[in-house]
């Protein structure tokens, strides 16, 4: 960094400045998770009040079994729609409470068709849900919803309807993109 005459050369100085800026940018870009400190308003659906989420799912016409995640200790809800069982996970929680968001999620074990290409095909035209392939080749489809401040019943019913619609689309998508074994079996018939 120092030249032989004791002065800092311009290249070294520029690298030092750029490194400092990169470190500062990284520090400021870290997400700050907001805790929902306010009580959940009457007839609102809030991740900070897991029972309100379960009640909202039931009000939309679906089952909702509230429990705790064995992995995180955070609340979770088990439900079903369009022939699929799914979970609702709670995030940005402090000791399993004051959660800020929820994630509707369904997971599938590897059937030989769970590839990044399959996930990219789904993600290329789905706005409200994301498909991802894990290291173990399991496939997950999820839909994240922030609830800080709460959602009214009509808004939350719309969220649940969008998720149910995505599950119906998922069924159609899997029929159009069968696993290799299922595709081979269909070709034999």
Describe each model-derived feature in a short phrase:
Residues 36-38, 100-142:
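Short, internal acidic amphipathic alpha-helical interface segments
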Residues 1-13:
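Short, Lys/Arg-enriched N-terminal segments with co-localized hydrophobic residues
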Residues 175-189:
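Short, highly charged C-terminal tails/helix-capping segments
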Residues 29-31:
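N-terminal signal peptide c-region/cleavage motif recognized by signal peptidases
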Residues 15-22:
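Sec-dependent signal peptide recognition
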Residues 80-111:
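Long, continuous compositionally biased terminal/linker segments
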Residues 33-83:
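Charge-rich, low-complexity N-terminal segments
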Residues 127-171:
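A short, solvent-exposed beta-edge/loop patch
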């Amino acid at each position: 960094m120092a030249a032989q005459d004791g002065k800092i050369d311009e290249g070294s100085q520029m690298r030092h400045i750029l490194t400092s800026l990169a470190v500062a940018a990284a520090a400021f870009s870290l997400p700050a998770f907001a805790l929902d400190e306010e009580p959940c308003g009457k007839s609102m659906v809030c991740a900070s009040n897991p029972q309100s989420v379960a009640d909202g799912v039931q009000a939309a016409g679906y089952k909702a079994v509230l429990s705790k995640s064995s992995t995180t200790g955070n609340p979770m809800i088990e439900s079903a729609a369009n022939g699929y069982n799914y979970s609702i996970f709670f995030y940005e929680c402090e000791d399993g409470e004051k959660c800020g968001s929820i994630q509707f999620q369904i997971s599938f074990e590897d059937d030989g068709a769970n590839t990044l290409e399959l996930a990219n095909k789904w993600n290329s035209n789905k706005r409200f849900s994301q498909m991802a392939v894990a290291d173990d080749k399991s496939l997950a489809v999820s839909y994240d919803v922030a609830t800080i401040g709460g959602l009214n019943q009509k808004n939350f019913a719309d969220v649940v309807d969008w998720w149910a619609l995505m599950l119906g689309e998922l069924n159609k998508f899997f029929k159009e993109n069968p696993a290799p074994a299922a595709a081979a079996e269909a070709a034999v018939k």
